Amino acid sequence: GVEDTTMNDIAQASKKGRRTLYTYFKSKEQIYMAVVESELEMLSTQMEKAASKPVSPDKKILELIMTHLDAIKMVVYRNGTLRADFFRDIWRVEAMRKEFDRKETALFRRVLHEGKEQNLFDIDNVEITADILHYCIKGIEVPYIRGQIGEELDDETGWRYVAKIVYGALGCKKKENNHI
């Protein structure tokens, strides 16, 4: 984790000199924060791309969920230190991702509004529904990353289950061919 990592370790891994690192960062914690911020910014970009795809809102909402879970999983696995800290110090990660969470919830709202306007979703309150959707997805991140959800299922079958739950919760009116 971050605590066991030295500035020398970081300098070697980044192929930079320690002096160079200290020019930009006062501590290894600042470097850690910069890495997390950078990863969250890339994640936001991926989410924005998914939300901007020219597909119907019912497909788009699933695309957002898949993008979120797969991207978080890749970030955590790509960064060994982040992986350890993600599971050990979830509160620190939580504080750092507030802006990402805000942007993601706004994307959910946008897609839910689209779906409601197109009469695809039967939801009473878009804002509350977006918040609930966001926290549901966030709540399954750790089991998803660890491969504990539907480990015996192939991806297509697993996502069909997700689609059924999501579409049911959103009162999805278009029933034919709703899965990705």
Name the predicted role of every residue range.
Residues 106-118, 131, 135-180:
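C-terminal peripheral helix-coil segments that are non-catalytic and often amphipathic
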Residues 3, 120-121:
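Conserved hydrophobic residue
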Residues 122, 126-130:
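Membrane-interface starts of transmembrane alpha-helices
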Residues 34, 38, 45-74, 129-133, ...:
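Hydrophobic alpha-helical connector segments
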Residues 2-30, 34:
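Helix-turn-helix
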Residues 69-109, 117:
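Short secondary-structure transition hinges
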Residues 32, 36, 40, 94-105, ...:
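Amphipathic, non-transmembrane alpha-helical scaffold segments
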Residues 50, 79-86, 144-148:
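Secondary-structure edge/capping motif, primarily at the C-terminal ends of alpha-helices
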